Amino acid sequence: MGGIGKKRVKKRTHLKADPIQEAAIPKSMVIRSGASEVGRSLSLLTRDLRHMMEPHTAIRLKERKANKIKDYLTMAGPLGVTHLLVLSRTDNNANLRIIRAPRGPSLHFRIHEYMLNKDVRRLQKNPKSPTTEFLTPPLLVMNHFNQNSSKDSPHEALLTTTFQNMFPPISVQHTNINSVKRVLLLNRRDDGYIDLRHFIISTKPVGISRPIRHLLKGEKKDSDIPDLHNVRDISDYVLHGDGISGAASDSEIEEDATVEIDRPVPTKTEENLLSASQLLKPKQQAIKLIEIGPRMTLELIKITEDAMGGKVLYHSHVHKSKEEIKQQDNFHEQSRALKEKRKKEQDENVRRKRENKKRRKDQKKEGITSSNKNDDSGNEGSSAYSDTE
């Protein structure tokens, strides 16, 4: 007989994610240096950047004023975090630092201009509110970025690789095109500034009349069902579009904005409205990008070797001679050697203290054992004396 009152454990039927693949996915944290001291505007930008980095980011992270960047780097390893995006503010500028956790390098940017999500929506005539677009990572599009470094620009490859490694790679052969819902555009201008734009992808079927498109849209959402109370017959609506009012006319779609995808399993409405030839041929979709923010204009200031400072690999405003670079290398070599020496001394001190603690513990144990033996021998002598009496 089964256990009465035993709680039933539901077994999930969907496939579990591969832990190896989960570990390979880049994860990020967007934090404010100094917490609320950066101001309200930069705090809102932090929130918008967290939405942009979804779903593999800490969306509800709460910073404290006492938290330091070193604390986040310490926790990055156990949590699997690969990148830290640190926003800070000085008296004159707002700054963004991208740190490759846990040991660097670090890319330091100056934020010249930025616009929040709410400001971008305010500029649009028909703003679109995202729904399920943040369940999948965005598609990264980079323009005017170099894969190979040169003597004049040794930092180009590192800059490009850093941005690419912040998001999971997309395979053209295996990625489902319907899972790509957002686009993150990074455009490198001639003056070296980087424009960041964030879009959601809106698709619309091509080759289908507007009345049929309205009916297909109404099948998914009741509020989109067209009003047919003025139409005598459904054919008047399908053939002539009677009953459609207040909608803007469709603009002509460019060929570059039209793609063909494999048609999924048709719905009942599609089977009734579309012909057999239309159901068999690939489905054409018109793609439109709708900006949702945030916007940023970044300038790369410098690149450092470590997560917390270290050797300066590149600086946009400071140019050193070969002799100065050699002196800098010698200084960092001495600092690294001194750091390793101190670490060895600390490890040796910890080992010695543990050995001393263990030795004292063993001596204490031996002392208790010897005292117990003496007590036992004394008890035996007293018992023998009592027997002779």
UniProtKB/Swiss-Prot annotation:
Keywords per UniProt: Phosphoprotein
Keyword Membrane annotated: no
Disordered: annotated segments: 323-389
Matching SMART domains: Brix
InterPro entries according to UniProt: Brix, PPAN-like
GO molecular function: rRNA binding
Keyword Nucleotide-binding attached: no
Domain of life: Eukaryota
Chain ranges of the Brix domain: 28-309
One GO cellular component term noted in the UniProt record for this chain: preribosome, large subunit precursor
Compositionally biased intervals (Basic and acidic residues): 323-350
Composition-biased stretches (Polar residues): 379-389
UniProt feature, compositional bias: Basic residues: 351-362
One Pfam family this sequence matches: Brix
Example of a GO biological process term: maturation of LSU-rRNA from tricistronic rRNA transcript (SSU-rRNA, 5.8S rRNA, LSU-rRNA)
Annotated positions of the Phosphoserine modification: 377
Name of this chain's protein: Brix domain-containing protein C1B9.03c
Organism: Schizosaccharomyces pombe (strain 972 / ATCC 24843)
